[in-house]
Amino acid sequence: MRNVNTIKINFKGGIISPSGLYNILISVSKSHLLYVRFGLRQQLLIDVNIEDMDFIRAELNMLGIIYEINKDEYPNIVSSYPAEEIFIIDTWLTGDTYKRIFEMIDYTPRLKINISDSNQSFTPLLTGNINWVASPSDRDYWHLFIRFPKTNIVYEWKDVVHSKSVAAISKRIEEIIFAQAEKFYDNKDASGDELFELTKSGNFTTKTEEAPLTLPPYKLPYYEGINRYSDKYWLGIYRRDELFEIRFLKEACLLCIKTGIEQLCSTPWKTIIIKGIQEKNRYDWNLLLDKYQINMRHAANELNFQVDDNSLKALKLKHHLVKYLNDDDTRTFGVCIGIKTRLKSEVFSSILVRRKPLIRIGKGGLFYVYDILCAKDFNPNERTAFAFSKDNPKFLLAEQLRRAVLSFYKYHGKTDVVKAVVTNEVESPDAEP
């Protein structure tokens, strides 16, 4: 029996009001809670002892906060807004555009929605059910990828959709999927073409897609520390155990309010980013980091892991694998490693470690082993392409993962050589016609 319940609070697109978060933290800290966490879908997660639940619920209800307990029936909307300005520069998609779309989503989605710039790989493009990716060439138009619920079927929409119709089409698609669940929900034969035809009756601003979208290559930026952009700074904070001390977050919120920062952001890496720090306030932020001993320079091979939410087993396995890779001094730049411990959960990864029982008993099992799966072209925005290694016991897993990482570099080394050869042939004046 669980002695702890998890309260989930969504923040659309990972945009968090400092004053709103501060009020939540004040309320939950009255029950002597010390830590909160952030999830893969940029949501706030609060672990509460059963005996404190009634008090916490009353506090959140007083604030008018919408929340779920031990459920995710209404998933948060994921967006690349946290990367805007700092990791994404050459784009038509501005912070105001994100916010206008969020305002138009005037219902509470039951399907997972991702809203992403195409010119980035900091946030996942296709881990939602309704995945909007900004057109790299058509201003205010979006490509749409449907991943049917409880399946790995991905369908690229035949039209590109104007920003003003993103919310309405999202709502219409959700209505159709749930109204005809036998066709579109947990059905490996779901038809994207049929869903497309069923939405055409709506009054939406769209135009025919000229060509399929080419997904961007995966390059994870270093997302922690105090870093300069334009004439300001951004601060990224990662916690190894995923736990953010409430006292620290409260002071961070107050400092945001004091210095005129209107929002902070949660990210799909279970971190926070604070943008818009002025030069004159940088010292204050450094003092706050010093006060709470916030380490800012973790190894890249730790920062590129994604693990299931609410999974201590996944987190412990991550630490085990990171230690092995560190001890071996293995290079992991450019690789996103995921750990999946639950059936049909969605984890963003180039290389996925999937835990499974040899003997399944209901929702549990006995004698767990691990598969290592690789995405197409090792791009985490693509679907799984092949199994690198299957049924590994834990004592062999770390070495098998190291070998999978080596295969990543071997693959990219070969493709880069091919690209270089092709480029030279095209550019050489002596090449045969």
Predicted regions mapped to residue ranges:
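N-terminal intrinsically disordered, low-complexity tails enriched in polar/charged
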Residues: 1-10, 427-433
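Small-residue-enriched alpha-helical segments and adjacent helix-cap loops
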Residues: 3-150, 236-362
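General structural signal for secondary-structure boundaries
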Residues: 17-18, 49-51, 93-94, 161-166, ...
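Aromatic-residue detector
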Residues: 36-38, 46, 182-183, 191, ...
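Mobile "lid/hinge" segments at catalytic clefts and subdomain interfaces of large enzymes
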Residues: 105-202, 359-433
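Long, internal scaffold/assembly segments composed of regular secondary structure
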Residues: 177-270, 275-278
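N-terminal secretory/membrane-targeting helices
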Residues: 210-219, 246-249, 254-256, 314-315, ...
